[in-house]
């Protein structure tokens, strides 16, 4: 049974009561994305975040001026010092600057066991303003795909990872199959950049089944760091002992609820100051466990090799098969949503 997610005032060790997730990635000095956004998201979901820095970026909402990559030995030292007394239940990887960093992470993860942490790779390639963050060779990308448990690209990142154009539903599925063929255990593609979709439709593919998560498009401003937020929330819900399907559903709902909580207020402030919403990338507010039924996606389940078994689950039924143990958050079937 997982320890209660609370901190005793008498405790001298912060991590004795709160599960730990490591965030590997770049520092965004504006705080809108990167490991800063990861740590904020994890804290919001009652997880202690440890940060392993791959690079320092000088950026704002609109521009990246420069970046400085950490050498692989410095990244290795961060791993060593944390692993001694703060081992992770999960690892969320974001921007990796180069092959040396990536190979170090792969080697370290492959040697970690008893227990092995769940590893999420959000393959961040560039900033919202277009600055390049990752320069990885194809062979190293393949090594990462074979090492992590799930990779969470957006449409542009999926095209880069596979060297395939992703311009419609057919090419999307072809690219996902290419990633699976390269060794990816599971793939979650974020559909926010899929211009051909009427709604935003994310897709999860693993060896046994496919899930689609559909949400209405949100046109009321841009929110920075949503990719970081979703991957971190996924890691958090996995650590809180939700099965992968429920964890993805909750992570999707969390981002949707943060977006709905943040953008209307900040768009109103922007309008009051005559700032163009199209040019403003807003900073997310914290939200906690997603609880509004309207924040949850429509989830469509498809068992691979059994097309007649496809079924839809709406916001009031969700996914029944939660493996959540007693802890800080309830199983979906134990809430008014289940």
Report the location of each language-model feature:
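Conserved phosphate/ATP/ADP-binding segment of small-molecule kinases
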Residues: 131-210, 219
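Substrate-binding N-lobe of the ribokinase-like
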Residues: 3-90
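Glycine/small-residue-rich loop that forms an oxyanion/phosphate-binding "nest" at active or ligand-binding sites
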Residues: 88-143
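Short pre-catalytic strand/loop immediately N-terminal to key active-site residues, enriched for Gly-Thr
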Residues: 24-30, 211-225
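Charged C-terminal helix
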Residues: 18, 69, 245-338
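Phosphate-handling active-site elements
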Residues: 13, 46-50, 210-211, 237-252
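Short, small-residue alpha-helix embedded
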Residues: 39-41, 159-160, 220-244, 248
């Amino acid at each position: 049974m997982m320890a209660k997610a609370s901190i005793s005032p008498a405790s001298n060790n912060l991590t004795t009561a709160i599960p730990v997730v490591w965030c590997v990635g770049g520092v965004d000095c504006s705080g809108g994305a990167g490991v800063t956004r990861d740590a904020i998201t994890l804290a919001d979901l009652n997880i202690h975040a440890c940060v392993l820095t791959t690079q320092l970026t000088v950026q704002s909402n609109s521009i990246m001026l420069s970046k400085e990559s950490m050498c692989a030995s410095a990244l290795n030292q961060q791993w060593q010092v944390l692993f001694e007394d703060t081992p992770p239940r999960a690892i969320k990887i974001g921007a990796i600057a180069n092959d040396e960093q990536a190979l170090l992470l792969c080697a370290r993860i492959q040697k970690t066991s008893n227990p092995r942490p769940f590893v999420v790779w959000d393959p961040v390639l560039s900033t919202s303003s277009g600055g390049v963050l990752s320069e990885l060779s194809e062979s190293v990308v393949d090594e990462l795909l074979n090492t992590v448990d799930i990779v969470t690209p957006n449409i542009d990142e999926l095209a880069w990872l596979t060297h395939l154009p992703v311009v419609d539903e057919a090419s999307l599925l072809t690219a996902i199959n290419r990633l699976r063929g390269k060794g990816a255990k599971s793939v979650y593609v974020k559909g926010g950049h899929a211009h051909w979709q009427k709604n935003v439709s994310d897709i999860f593919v693993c060896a046994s089944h496919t899930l689609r998560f559909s949400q209405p498009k949100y046109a009321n401003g841009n929110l920075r760091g949503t990719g970081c937020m979703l991957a971190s929330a996924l890691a958090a819900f996995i650590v809180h002992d939700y099965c992968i399907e429920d964890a993805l559903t909750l992570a999707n709902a969390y981002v949707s609820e943060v977006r709905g909580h943040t953008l209307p207020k900040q768009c109103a402030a922007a309008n009051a100051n005559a700032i163009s919403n199209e040019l403003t990338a807003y900073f997310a507010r914290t939200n906690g466990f997603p609880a509004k039924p309207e924040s949850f996606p429509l989830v469509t389940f498809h068992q691979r090799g059994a097309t007649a078994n496809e079924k839809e689950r709406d916001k009031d039924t969700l996914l029944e098969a939660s493996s959540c143990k007693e802890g800080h958050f309830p199983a979906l079937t134990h809430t008014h949503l289940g």
